[in-house]
Curated annotation (Swiss-Prot):
It comes from the Bacteria. The gene is rsmG. GO terms for cellular component: cytosol. This is Ribosomal RNA small subunit methyltransferase G. Signal peptide: none annotated. It comes from Erwinia tasmaniensis (strain DSM 17950 / CFBP 7177 / CIP 109463 / NCPPB 4357 / Et1/99). The keyword Hydrolase does not apply. Belongs to the methyltransferase superfamily. RNA methyltransferase RsmG family. It is found in: Cytoplasm. One of its GO terms (molecular function) is rRNA (guanine-N7-)-methyltransferase activity. Keywords: Cytoplasm, Methyltransferase, rRNA processing, S-adenosyl-L-methionine, Transferase.
């Protein structure tokens, strides 16, 4: 599997250390193993996980500004775990309301020796982000309106919201509440992934 990952990374123009590649493959192996009992993802094939979970997450890394991030509605750790592996100098809080997902993430943290993630079981509305985060990240979590409404208390004044989307959500962008603006929209190129991918970056006015 590490050879396929290396080939995908090369196609995407992403350079990682051998240790980072081993951690990413280790994460996929754990996800595949735990998925049988815990139903953590609808993707069953580890090779597909490399594309749809690993590559689809780490292509976002160059766009992230700051050192403290929170991944809301992280599920089994997406995109937070792959991002933590490829950016070891940053810290990622992984927030989910389901205990089985957080238990899985704590096992990932232990087995992969990831000291820059903190799994937390909580609803996002009830989680106090202190000190404020540099960035709030979500992937398949909610509409842009719901994201900024539910998570408005988490980023600092200069913090940003990073929403991973498929087709560009023009209706969601038009429905953003007052006080928030789209700072940037980046098409994301994910090798072997069909369909469009976009990163929408939102800042406060």
């Amino acid at each position: 599997m590490i050879n396929q990952l290396s080939a995908l990374l090369k196609t995407a123009g992403i350079s990682l250390s051998d240790r980072q590649k081993q951690q990413l493959v280790g994460y996929v192996e754990m996800l595949h193993k735990w998925n049988k009992a815990y139903n953590l993802t609808s993707v069953r094939d580890p090779q597909q996980m490399l594309v749809r979970h690993i590559l689809d997450s780490i292509v976002v890394e160059p766009h992230l500004i700051g050192e403290r991030f929170i991944d809301v509605g992280t599920g089994p750790g997406l995109p937070g775990v792959p991002l933590a592996i490829v950016r070891p100098g940053a810290h990622f809080t992984l927030l989910d309301s389901l205990g089985k997902r957080v238990r899985f993430l704590k096992q990932v943290q232990h087995e992969l020796k990831l000291d820059n993630i903190t799994p937390v079981q909580s609803r996002v509305e009830e989680f106090a982000g202190e000190p404020p985060f540099d960035g709030v990240i979500s992937r398949a979590f909610a509409s842009l309106n719901d994201m900024v409404s539910w998570c408005h208390h988490l980023p600092g004044q200069q913090g940003r919201f990073y929403a991973l989307k498929g087709v560009l959500p023009e209706e969601e962008i038009a429905a953003l509440p007052a006080g928030f603006r789209v700072e940037n929209i980046s098409p994301l190129i994910v090798p072997q992934l069909e369909g469009e991918r976009h990163l929408v970056v939102i800042a406060r006015h």
